Amino acid sequence: MTYNPRIGGFTHVKQASFDVHVKRGEAQPRTSFAQQIKRIFSKIGETLGQLFRHRAPDSAPGRVRLQGVRYVGSYRPTGDAKQAIRHFVDEAVKQVAHARTPEIRQDAEFGRQVYEATLCAIFSEAKDRFCMDPATRAGNVRPAFIEALGDAARATGLPGADKQGVFTPSGAGTNPLYTEIRLRADTLMGAELAARPEYRELQPYARQQAIDLVANALPAERSNTLVEFRQTVQTLEATYRRAAQDASRDEKGATNAADGA
């Protein structure tokens, strides 16, 4: 069973075989990055499918209503929606860490795939965050930022390709463990809390927790690379945002000067 983000649910898929028969002395080909990401989501989908199936209606935790918000009865409500949502996100992180940390450490191939997927997610999220912000339109800042971001991703050893001189990782997308954390949190808190704006505001926190979870489970070398890449991306964002602000001021100054002439 595999989670399909387009439909927000799980679908049954025929499990593909990744076994490759090779002759002695021949190099065994590496599975494509897309197949690797599919394997991660397949594992997550199987676990969550079991979680949902085993949750019988009569065993669901009781709910209490407080200030118009419905909270899961296993948690003592405070009336602060954001605090309650944070509690459920933290609980989801604990559950995912309990399930995935041993697997990342014991299954070298799965650990590598999660590591590369997390690096790709950091790349994609930074690119989208920067390029979709109207404040970064000024000058030629966006292409320069993407090029610098690609160089930083290349330095980590991620598989990818140059597109018009800019490096792009092969598997850019969402961190699969962040997806699992969010799905578990949705289940824990219920639809009413999950629909509140405070939950959307906490998504950067949930993404950060997913990165920290992976970093804590990885060997030291990969953990350090992950942390350093995240710090590099943050530095690049800050640097190019300042450049965009400067370019915007220059453009406004030139426009005002032309109007006054």
Swiss-Prot record:
UniProt subcellular location: Secreted
GO aspect biological process, one term: actin cytoskeleton organization
Keywords: GTPase activation, Guanine-nucleotide releasing factor, Secreted, Virulence
GO molecular function annotation: GTPase activator activity; guanyl-nucleotide exchange factor activity
Record InterPro entries: SopE, SopE-like_GEF_dom_sf, SopE_GEF_dom
Predominant cellular place of this UniProt entry's protein: secreted
pH dependence of activity: Active in pH ranges of 3.5-10.5.
GO cellular component terms listed in the entry, alphabetical order: extracellular region
Signal peptide interval: none
Quaternary structure, from the entry: Monomer. Interacts with human CDC42.
Function summary: Activator for both CDC42 and RAC1 by directly interacting with these Rho GTPases and acting as a guanine nucleotide exchange factor (GEF). This activation results in actin cytoskeleton rearrangements and stimulates membrane ruffling, thus promoting bacterial entry into non-phagocytic cells.
Note: Immunogenic protein that elicits T-cell-mediated immunity in mice.
Family named by the database record: Belongs to the GEF (guanine exchange factor) SopE family.
The protein, known as: Guanine nucleotide exchange factor BopE
Species this chain originates from: Burkholderia pseudomallei (strain K96243)
